[in-house]
């Protein structure tokens, strides 16, 4: 009986992994650094307009954009394309380090809100996504900094300045929590 349950669980896990791999394969041409972290979250660099309808067809409910107007992107156009695809649009403009408390709180609130899931989180290159995801994993989910940094790097965190900003934010806020 236990072995049948184990086999069923393994089959379900494999089916989920195959589903996520299929989504990644379908979107990789339209979305740089597209990565399905799990059933509820995907991360990416700047998506092409065509990606939003594909996300919706795979059951995504929202897109969280961390880009700013100062980057020369048309945020209004992106919002229009996302909403046209039937997705909820969230923008938390993140500029240069350091990470700001209001931005981190808004990020964590958006990520934790179940009505936003599944959610794709993006910026220009996935650097900021990785930095904010790292902070979320450590401060909200209780992950170790090493594990969080590993996942942030996989997402796209390559900037030494953003890595340091995330580590500094974590250090400052871990001390406050103690």
Label each PLM-derived region with a short phrase:
Residues 119-130:
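A phosphate-binding catalytic loop at a beta-strand-loop-alpha-helix junction
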Residues 1-9:
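Bacterial N-terminal signal peptides
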Residues 10-119, 134-178:
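Cys-dependent protein tyrosine phosphatase-like superfamily
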């Amino acid at each position: 009986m236990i072995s049948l349950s184990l086999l069923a669980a393994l089959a379900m896990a494999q089916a989920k992994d195959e589903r996520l791999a299929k989504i990644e394969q379908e979107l990789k041409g339209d979305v740089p650094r597209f990565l399905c972290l799990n059933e509820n979250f995907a991360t990416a660099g700047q998506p092409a307009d065509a990606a939003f309808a594909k996300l919706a067809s795979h059951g995504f409910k929202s897109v969280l954009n961390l880009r700013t107007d100062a980057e020369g992107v048309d945020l209004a156009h992106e919002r229009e394309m996302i909403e046209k695809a039937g997705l909820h649009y969230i923008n938390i403009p993140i500029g240069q380090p350091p990470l700001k408390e209001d931005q981190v709180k808004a990020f964590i609130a958006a990520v934790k809100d179940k009505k936003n899931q599944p959610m794709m989180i993006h910026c220009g290159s996935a650097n900021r996504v990785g930095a904010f995801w790292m902070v979320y994993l450590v401060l909200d989910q209780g992950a170790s900094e090493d594990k969080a940094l590993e996942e942030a790097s996989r997402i796209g965190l390559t900037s030494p300045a953003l890595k340091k900003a995330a580590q500094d934010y974590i250090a400052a806020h871990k001390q406050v929590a103690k």
